[in-house]
Amino acid sequence: MSHKPAHLLLVDDDPGLLKLLGLRLTSEGYSVVTAESGAEGLRVLNREKVDLVISDLRMDEMDGMQLFAEIQKVQPGMPVIILTAHGSIPDAVAATQQGVFSFLTKPVDKDALYQAIDDALEQSAPATDERWREAIVTRSPLMLRLLEQARLVAQSDVSVLINGQSGTGKEIFAQAIHNASPRNSKPFIAINCGALPEQLLESELFGHARGAFTGAVSNREGLFQAAEGGTLFLDEIGDMPAPLQVKLLRVLQERKVRPLGSNRDIDINVRIISATHRDLPKAMARGEFREDLYYRLNVVSLKIPALAERTEDIPLLANHLLRQAAERHKPFVRAFSTDAMKRLMTASWPGNVRQLVNVIEQCVALTSSPVISDALVEQALEGENTALPTFVEARNQFELNYLRKLLQITKGNVTHAARMAGRNRTEFYKLLSRHELDANDFKE
């Protein structure tokens, strides 16, 4: 059974039953926090964002109905499910009349409980449509604030620059902004500006006329035209070659695009969202990124936190990704062991969510058990240390190694090294600056 990601508060003064129910719900993909009294449950609600409360009825000091009454004072819309071993039909009727969402008798049928949870979450969902952000699984206050900013920004057409480390989900975030915008019925088109050679990138963005270059056998519209009325997402904008930065600036200023080999301008109507993992102000200081283009793109800046900055999302994400991977490959896989989840929580995650996806895919591929073990997670994390980099990361590493080799061969002679690389001195110095290399370090 597949469930929407949700954060549940379980309240019961029986630690054994509390633990058992918590494990069962965690294995179903829910994020769970527990409390052994009504007072403790209220403290949890004060410090955490909870989607649903499940409480035992009979508890010392504050019973389930008293807890429900207190919850309604501070969070009136919070759905509450009451569990009891001593229930009766009049009790259930009275509870639901007071606003309790569901009143279930112990021992609780698991399917009835899961259905009650899903129904409660569905009914308590905000009136506004939240499907725009359904691909972003989070309960982190950092991310929730960022999503609220994104929702507000989406209503206008201002350019947005998304900053964040590789693997944090910048494209998914850009897609969410598009989904929340008035342009959501039009195309969302993404391109990685660092993954293509300059001429090919120019042709992809602006299109080309027949005969514009060898192989251009027909007219072809570019992505600016393909995204007409919608959103164009320029990923890794910091890696865009300087000549194309000039052309992009002109397009943004004039709202017109001229295909390669054409003398005709075409009006465009697109919203621009860009993203980078680079420090663009530093790139501007080194002369690698145009200041005027930066301010055109950076009307609103959003920074996605690294996964290590929102560890509270790891159980939620891990269970969500496990369900997806299991559905595709091994439906019998159900959960992580306690130690496996602890290891996921304490890992450093330099590759962020992308790395977490890879680790979980590997765990599901290799497990023969319904429960992912700690040893399997450890193995997958160690394997990630030798995992293939992305294309852009691999290209950057190649450039760095290549430049070092050139400078070693030429003993730091930039003129000679640039000639060997087939670049002029200005371009070569920019390459050295991008990779923070100093030719003087290679002179004998």
Swiss-Prot record:
| GO BP terms | DNA-templated transcription; phosphorelay signal transduction system; positive regulation of DNA-templated transcription
Q: Where in the cell is it found?
A: Cytoplasm
Question: Where does the UniProt entry say this protein principally localizes?
Answer: cytoplasm
Output one GO MF annotation: cis-regulatory region sequence-specific DNA binding
- The residues covered by the Response regulatory domain are 7-121
PTM text: Phosphorylated by GlrK.
Which UniProt keywords are present, listed alphabetically?
Answer: ATP-binding, Cytoplasm, DNA-binding, Nucleotide-binding, Phosphoprotein, Transcription, Transcription regulation, Two-component regulatory system
Q: Which Gene3D superfamilies match?
A: 1.10.8.60, 3.40.50.2300, Homeodomain-like, P-loop containing nucleotide triphosphate hydrolases
Residues that bind ATP? 164-171, 227-236
Q: Where is the Sigma-54 factor interaction domain?
A: 136-366
Q: Which GO CC terms are listed, alphabetically?
A: cytoplasm; protein-DNA complex
Q: List the InterPro entries hit by this protein, alphabetically.
A: AAA+_ATPase (IPR003593), CheY-like_superfamily (IPR011006), Homeodomain-like_sf (IPR009057), P-loop_NTPase (IPR027417), Sig_transdc_resp-reg_receiver (IPR001789), Sigma_54_int (IPR002078), Sigma_54_int_dom_ATP-bd_1 (IPR025662), Sigma_54_int_dom_ATP-bd_2 (IPR025943)
Q: What happens when the protein's gene is inactivated?
A: Mutants show decreased amounts of glmY.
Top-rank lineage group of the source organism: Bacteria
Task: Tell me which residues form the DNA-binding region.
Answer: 414-433
- Point out residues bearing the modification 4-aspartylphosphate: 56
What more does the entry say?
A: Not required for the regulation of the glmY-glmZ-glmS regulatory cascade by glucosamine-6-phosphate depletion.
Function (record text): Member of the two-component regulatory system GlrR/GlrK that up-regulates transcription of the glmY sRNA when cells enter the stationary growth phase. Regulates glmY transcription by binding to three conserved sites in the purL-glmY intergenic region.
This chain belongs to which protein, by name?
Answer: Transcriptional regulatory protein GlrR
Q: Which organism is it from?
A: Escherichia coli (strain K12)
